[in-house]
Amino acid sequence: MMKRKIKLALADDHMLFRQGLIALLSDYDELKVVTEVPNGLELVKSLKNRPVDVAIIDYEMPEMDGLEATRQIRLKYPDTKIISLTMHNSEELILQLLDKGSNGFLLKDFDSEKVVDAIYAVIENGYYFNDHISKDMLHYVMKSKKLKPKFGISALTDKEIQIIRLICEEKTNKEISDILNLSPRTVEGSRAKIIAKINVKNTAGIVLYAIKNNIIY
């Protein structure tokens, strides 16, 4: 049975950027851009007759910016996942977008793997953050209940929990290997297993999982 395609909408006021992103996503058979518009106003209008699974929205646009578009989409189309695009890695901006209902963030220097990861992450887990966001910010996001990610149930070993705690302390693989008397390769393999077990994409996902499950406080 053929899988249902993930339907996408793209809102960005730079036509060349839209075209480039559409070309990039066209390499993935399971993804389909059904709407591309230059501003938030047209995006919100389009969703009435052409609903999508994920809306990818630039923050800075004329007529209606990404912040207001996010607010309206979350109000009118609560099942639509939203990925915000921005040039600025500003925690203040991230909080504003979270308040309006965004599910994740991409800086506009992303590569193809990052945007595809983000699309699948918001569909599967309800969120996506890159590794540039700070641990303190992730902790605030979780404790303020601005985001409610869905995590798969998993059975972590004591060693994996130790590694998660050290990752949350921003230790490198080398530092973790020294602390736990393991080889760096073993730590790297354990990190990959942890990511697969808890169904996240990156270190930010590990930290969110740890906060959600009281592995760190």
PLM region descriptions:
Residues 61:
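Receiver (REC) domain active-site loop signature in two-component systems and cognate sites
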Residues 138-166:
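Regulatory hinge/linker segments at domain boundaries
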Residues 39, 65-68:
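Acidic catalytic/metal-coordinating carboxylates
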Residues 45-46, 67-79:
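Short amphipathic alpha-helix used as the core "switch/output" element in two-component signaling
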Residues 192-217:
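Basic, Lys/Arg-enriched C-terminal extension of HTH/homeodomain DNA-binding domains
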Residues 58, 86:
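Active-site residues of response regulator receiver
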Residues 51-56:
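Active-site beta3 strand of CheY-like receiver
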